[in-house]
Every structure is written in C-alpha cells, then in structure tokens.
C-alpha cells in the first residue's frame, strides 16, 4: 500500500495551529491539516436561548461553512441557494456536540459561545480539523471571559480533538486526505477527549463492509493520532 502523500499508515499530515488569527473574536485560530485549512473563531455573547433562560447556565453552538473555491471547482454559496445543505448541518451539529462535551455549562454563566468554522481550503478532514482547531480557540475565549469576570469557575472539563481514519487499499490509515478519502473502502471520524474517552465515532463502509478487527485497528490508530493532536494543541496554547 502506497499513500499518495508518501506518508506511513500511522502518520498524520503536517499540522499547524496559529492562535489569535483574527482581531475581533474572543478566540480564533487558523488550523492546518496538510492542505486543509480552516479558520475557527469563538464569539461570546451575553444571554442564552429561551429554553435555558433563568437556569444559570450557558450554551455553545456551532456553524460550519466552506468558501466557494475552497475545493477544486467552485461551489455555489449556500446563502445564495437559500438554505444549508444536509452535509453542512450534520457537520456543524457534530462540532457543537463535540465542543459542548469539553465544557461544564453550569460554570459558563448565562452566556452563549458561537463557534464558527470556515473552510478556506479543503483537502479532506475538514470536520476533524475544525473540532481540533476550535478547541484551542475555545480555550482562548474562556480566558478572555475569565478576565471579564463573566464565568462562575473554570468551565473547561477536558481537551477535545478529532481525526479521520479509514481502510485504504486494504490497510488501516490515519488522517485521510481527499485522494485517500475519495477512494477509501471505509471512512471513520473519531472525536475523543484527552482523558481517553470517545465523544463520537462516525463510520461508513464505502466498498466492502468492514470487520470488527478492522474497526479495532482503526480505533487504535485514531487513539495514537489523538495523542499527537493533544500535544500539538498544548504546544500551541503554550506559545
């Protein structure tokens, strides 16, 4: 098995997390997984959705989008079509669920955090890059809210990261790029905490069904890659 990028089966793409990437948001990063590049911002607003009012806790929600020419051919903006596509809705819900798992919302006060993940260049793994980058932006945003005195304590329970794994040419591989993803027999997206817990596992067989042993091999690869991602997040936050 030869990967198009020349990487080993258990090798992540080169990853970079650049903090404070935009001026106005409470937290922002540019996250790069190889040629996939996503701007993640976290905006804080006072108040919560109606279903949470008066309960003394906060909320976090997420939106996801792709620039029209983030892909090989231009895609029409969803705004010009008048509605979001099913893929977009699925991904932004995944991002929101994943980031909420990192927080104790009761310590957020009655504040809402808006996660915005905008893909400026896509080469596979945009949802996993978004979650990994948005976690760092979230931690920066919480630091800003702490300075403002808006928090009841430290809402952060754990770090969160995500990575893709799959079966490519019969072999489990880590962190698929677009060429691999489009030809993979199986594609799996894994979201985990730095304590080793799973938040979400999304898996689909594109060719032949995958066997339990292959699923276990992919999950082991994901766990291995996740440790590297948490180290990269911590290194970015230490800068």
UniProtKB/Swiss-Prot annotation:
Its EC number is 2.7.7.56. GO terms for molecular function: 3'-5'-RNA exonuclease activity; RNA binding; tRNA binding; tRNA nucleotidyltransferase activity. The keyword NADP does not apply. SUPFAM superfamilies: Ribonuclease PH domain 2-like, Ribosomal protein S5 domain 2-like. GO terms for biological process: rRNA catabolic process; rRNA processing; tRNA processing. Homohexameric ring arranged as a trimer of dimers; dimeric protein does not seem to be catalytically active. This is Ribonuclease PH.
